[in-house]
């Protein structure tokens, strides 16, 4: 299984600086925009469904809204699951926004949570895991911790700097 780390640079994070008024809003908007672009890329290039995991419900809800209006020329079909009642039926959309890793999921996972996914080599594994790291120190440290966790499990790790 492949784990891809997308490391967003300072220059990338500043692209939307004129659209919002505070630095934290710039960062949040830049991350949401990147997640939308990455989601569209995954849908275009993969036959697998995508699960986006985040333990911050407010960010999942903001992403839900952003995905509906992200690109006027395309549509990203998705669903937001706000409860922990994960069923195959609820995971039937091409993109699912959820707070925890669903059991027996074998598609692509975009992990926005602060910790690495608890993956077992004995169970069903996702095809690929995507991790996003922002330039702030907290995110960098979380990224290092995730990298070590996945490396120690023997997964293939790929690094993509985004500027």
Where on the chain are the PLM-derived regions?
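Glycine-rich phosphate-binding "P-loop"
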Residues: 1-31
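General small-molecule cofactor/ligand-binding pocket signal
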Residues: 4-6, 96-98, 158-160
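Short, well-structured hydrophobic secondary-structure segments
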Residues: 31-88
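Conserved beta-strand elements of the Class I
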Residues: 50-51, 108-110, 130
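Structural motif
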Residues: 53-57, 111-115, 134-135
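Short catalytic/ligand-binding loop motif for oxyanion handling, primarily in non-cytosolic enzymes
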Residues: 60-62, 119, 139
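Mid-chain, well-packed structural core segment of small domains
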Residues: 86-125
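Glycine-rich, aromatic-bearing surface loops/beta-hairpins
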Residues: 127-163
């Amino acid at each position: 299984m492949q784990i891809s780390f997308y490391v967003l640079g300072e220059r990338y994070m500043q692209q939307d600086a004129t659209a919002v008024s505070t630095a934290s809003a710039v960062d949040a908007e830049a991350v949401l925009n990147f997640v939308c672009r990455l989601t569209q890329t995954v849908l275009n290039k993969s036959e697998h469904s995508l699960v986006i995991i985040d333990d911050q419900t407010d960010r999942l809800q903001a992403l839900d809204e952003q995905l509906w209006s992200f690109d006027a020329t395309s549509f990203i079909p998705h669903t937001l699951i706000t409860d922990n009642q994960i069923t195959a039926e609820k995971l039937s959309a091409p993109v699912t926004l959820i707070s925890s890793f669903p059991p027996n999921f074998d598609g692509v996972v975009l992990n926005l949570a602060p910790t690495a996914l608890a993956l077992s080599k004995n169970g069903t594994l996702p095809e690929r895991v995507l991790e996003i790291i922002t330039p702030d120190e907290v995110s960098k440290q979380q990224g290092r911790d995730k990298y070590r966790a996945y490396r120690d499990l023997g997964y293939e790790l790929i690094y993509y700097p985004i500027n």
